A protein has these predicted regions:
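HhH-family (HhH-GPD) DNA N-glycosylase catalytic core used in base-excision repair
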Residues: 1-260
């Protein structure tokens, strides 16, 4: 992109980010669910699980996030630590995510919370804030602890295992909620990470929108594409590159490549 075009693109992204990053965005987005809670552990649990099932139709995602909160009886951390999930009957949570997958996830979280006061504390102990790729380092640590809590078994429905290639869209989205703190949509309860360290939550819609805008050349929506796109956005806002996740969402709707 030439200098003039870069300036135009930045102005477009800034304008769209300001429009979408507003209180009105919350009501139709999965971020509404962790925002209902005040205790950090509750926020972490609901942020992770809401992000985990955040694929497909947004109305269905939100409906099934409500289902999770009902299962937890409105007290996620207490529910996890009581081990109440072990008696859940088989059933579907969201699309290809079933109760057996939920149990795997909650066993892992229970193991973590039995050793650390918060998931953030575990992240610090695992060196996540010092890593150049914090989301991938976090998932590596969580996968290891989840496997320990599940007889050595991993579950790709819960967390990806192919960390060399995965875009980690859902964990990067959860980290956006947990780390960014502008007092509007994202909650900023994690202080060990800075917004400048975050990476864009990449999916097919973000990828297509970014290519249409000339922000991304790579054709695959993988880890390398996340790095390339985030580096481009970081040149616009070194302190907060993922603010442009809102812009790419809004512009994606406008050009017909994002979920409604």
């Amino acid at each position: 992109m030439d200098t003039g075009n870069i300036k135009d693109i930045k102005e477009l992204l800034d304008s769209e980010a300001a429009r979408i990053n507003s209180p009105e965005f919350i009501a139709d987005d999965p971020v509404q669910f962790p925002r209902r809670f005040e205790r950090q552990q509750d926020i972490e649990i609901i942020a992770l699980l809401s992000a985990t099932i955040a694929w497909g139709n947004r109305k269905m995602i939100c409906r099934n996030c409500e289902k999770l909160i009902r299962i937890f009886e409105g007290r996620p951390y207490d529910y996890v630590m009581d081990g109440a999930y072990e008696t859940l009957p088989d059933g579907n949570i969201h699309r290809t995510f079933f109760v057996e997958n939920l149990k795997h996830y909650l066993r892992g979280l229970r193991s973590i919370y039995s050793r650390f006061s918060t998931l953030e504390e575990m992240a610090v102990a695992e060196g996540v804030p010092a890593d150049e790729m914090p989301a991938w380092r976090l998932v590596e640590a969580m996968n290891r602890r989840f496997a320990e809590a599940n007889g050595g078994m991993c579950d790709s429905r819960c967390l990806p295992g192919n960390l060399r290639t995965t875009a980690l869209k859902r964990i990067n989205m959860a980290l956006r909620w947990l780390v960014r703190d502008d007092g509007i949509v994202d909650m900023g309860v994690w202080k060990a990470l800075r917004p400048s360290q975050l990476f864009i939550p990449m999916d097919v819609h973000v990828g297509n929108t970014s290519r249409n805008l000339g922000l991304l050349q790579r054709r695959s929506n993988d880890r390398e594409a996340v790095i390339q796109l985030t580096d481009t956005l970081r040149a616009f806002r070194p302190d907060d590159p993922v603010i442009y996740d809102y812009a790419l969402f809004g512009l994606g709707i406008g050009i017909g490549v994002a979920n409604s």
